[in-house]
Amino acid sequence: VRLLVPAAAAFAYLLTAAALVVWPPLVALTLAVTWPFDRNRAAAGRLLRLCGAFVSRTFPFWRIRIEGRWPAGRQAYVVVANHQSFLDIFLLSNLPREMKWVAKRSLFKIPWVGWCFTMSGDIPVDRGDPASAAAVMARARRYLSRGMSVMMFPEGTRSRDGKLLPFKVGAFKLAVDAGVPVLPIAITGTAQGMPKGSPWVRPSELRVRILDPVPVGAGPGAEAVERLRSEVRRRIASALGERAEG
């Protein structure tokens, strides 16, 4: 029995490596076929998320639970989630809707994986670069205007201990400027399943909890952004069983 866990993990790593080799050509082919009529690159993006979902389910000692439901209808959202681990990307790929991810540019430079992000229309950002931030916001607004949701981690980095970090305002300014609701998501278990800074996985129950959308309130822009930021963080903190400080 003791040999089964490392053997299963080794097999899962092999499947993951195989998926990372096979998927980019499939995403490229999908993009080539659909790009004339798919401005949002929804088909290519959805295929990439299926790869992420596949990877998240290859490891037998991860128990995945999706709680709550994505809201009905075709409304676009600024989707925000707490960030515990690199595993969050794979776990959130199990969600039923395509959305474009805002992620640090270094991820887009990873061979194969980064190419898929680019082909899928995800949005790279250079941290600390105001020009990059402005370009990201403009591109994200275009997606939202075409009915495509945009995914952001408002903490800006992964939490080392799984505790919620302060939220930056970018995602909430985007929602206010675009006039779209925020869809909060609470993640638990990924900090244990793949700790920050480690490529090795551990047994864990991975949970994604989809919370109720938070509408953009009335009032001056800066005040609306701050109210939205505070309310969304409060809801995610409550779902995680934490106090809403920060």
Regions found by a protein language model. Give the residues of each.
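Short gly/ser/thr-rich secondary-structure transition/capping motifs
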Residues: F59-I66, A133-A134, T190-Q192
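Hydrophobic beta-strand scaffold residues
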Residues: R63-I64, P124, V150, V182
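Catalytic core of membrane glycerolipid acyltransferases/transacylases, capturing the structured
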Residues: V27-R46, L50, T58-F59, A72-P130
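Short acidic-hydrophobic, aromatic-tinged amphipathic segments that line or gate anion-handling sites
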Residues: I66, I123-D126, V216
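Membrane-interfacial terminal anchoring regions of lipid-handling membrane enzymes
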Residues: V1-V33, A43-R46, E226-G246
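Non-catalytic C-terminal accessory region of glycerolipid acyltransferases
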Residues: L3, A134-G246
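Generic preference for hydrophobic
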Residues: I66, V79, W101, V208-I210
